[in-house]
C-alpha cells in the first residue's frame, strides 16, 4: 500500500508550538487506499516538562511529529513526564474528500461556534452542505495559528467551549500519558482543561484527524499519538534572605 506523493502534509505543530502532533493532511490526488469507516480510532497524549528537559540538555528539535509512537522521544523525555494534567476531546465534525480540478483534498466540518472563535467566515468555506460547513486544513491551520499568536482570548474561548461540550480524558499518569479509544472517525478538538498545581500554563488547543497519515503516506492509521509541548513556569514559594 502506498499513497506517497499524494499527500501534502500540514503539521499541527505550527498551531501551538507543539512537538510531534498528528497532522491534518490534504490529499492532492486520487488514492486507491480508502478509509475503513467500520473502524474506530484512538488518541494518546504524552505530557512532558520541556523546559526542564531543555535545561538538562535534551535536544527536543531532533524529534519529528508523525502522529505515531516515537520510542526515542519517550526514552529521552521519560524523566520529565507530567502527572495530573487533564485533556478533553470533542468530535467537532466529519472529514470528507472533495474533488476539484482533477485533485482530491480532505475537507473538515466545523460547527458555527468554532468557526466564529477562529474567525472563519462563509466566504472561507470549501463546501457547504445543508447545515454543515467544511474548510480545508490550510484555512483551519492558518486561522488557529493567527488567533493564538498574540493573546489568550481565542485559547480561553476554546477552553470554555470545551468545558461545556467536551469529554474529559483520565488525568495523565506517572508516565505523563492519557488515552481514549473507541472513538468515531472524524475531526477532533483537543484542549488541556486542567494543569497540575505546580504548572501555570496549559498547552494551546489543537486538532486531530482520525484516521491520519504521516509524511510518507504509507497508509491510514487509526491510533494517533500526540506529544504536545509547552514551556512551563513552575510556582515556587518566595524566600526571605
Label each region the model flagged.
Residues 2-235, 241:
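Solvent-exposed loop/turn and edge beta-strand elements of beta-rich ligand-binding domains
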Amino acid at each position: 500500500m502506498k499513497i506517497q506523493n499524494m499527500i501534502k502534509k500540514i503539521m499541527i505543530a505550527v498551531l501551538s508550538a507543539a512537538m510531534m502532533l498528528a497532522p491534518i493532511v490534504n490529499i492532492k490526488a486520487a488514492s486507491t487506499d480508502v478509509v475503513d469507516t467500520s473502524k474506530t480510532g484512538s488518541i494518546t497524549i504524552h505530557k512532558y516538562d520541556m523546559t526542564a528537559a531543555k535545561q538538562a540538555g535534551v535536544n527536543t528539535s531532533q524529534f519529528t511529529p508523525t502522529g505515531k509512537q516515537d520510542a526515542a522521544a519517550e526514552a529521552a523525555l521519560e524523566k520529565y513526564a507530567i502527572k495530573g494534567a487533564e485533556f478533553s476531546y470533542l468530535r467537532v465534525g466529519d472529514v470528507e474528500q472533495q474533488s476539484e480540478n482533477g485533485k482530491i483534498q480532505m475537507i473538515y466540518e466545523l460547527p458555527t461556534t468554532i468557526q466564529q472563535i477562529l474567525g472563519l467566515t462563509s466566504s472561507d468555506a470549501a463546501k457547504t452542505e445543508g447545515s454543515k460547513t467544511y474548510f480545508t486544513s490550510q484555512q483551519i491551520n492558518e486561522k488557529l495559528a493567527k488567533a493564538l499568536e498574540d493573546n489568550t482570548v481565542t485559547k480561553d474561548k476554546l477552553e470554555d467551549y470545551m468545558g461545556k461540550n467536551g469529554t474529559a480524558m483520565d488525568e495523565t499518569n506517572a508516565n505523563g500519558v492519557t488515552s481514549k479509544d473507541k472513538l468515531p472517525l472524524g475531526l477532533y478538538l483537543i484542549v488541556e482543561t486542567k494543569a497540575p498545581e505546580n504548572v501555570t500554563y496549559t498547552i494551546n488547543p489543537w486538532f486531530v484527524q482520525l484516521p491520519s497519515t504521516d509524511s510518507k503516506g504509507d497508509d491510514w492509521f487509526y491510533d494517533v499519538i500526540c506529544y504536545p509541548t509547552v514551556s512551563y513556569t513552575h510556582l515556587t514559594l518566595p524566600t526571605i534572605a
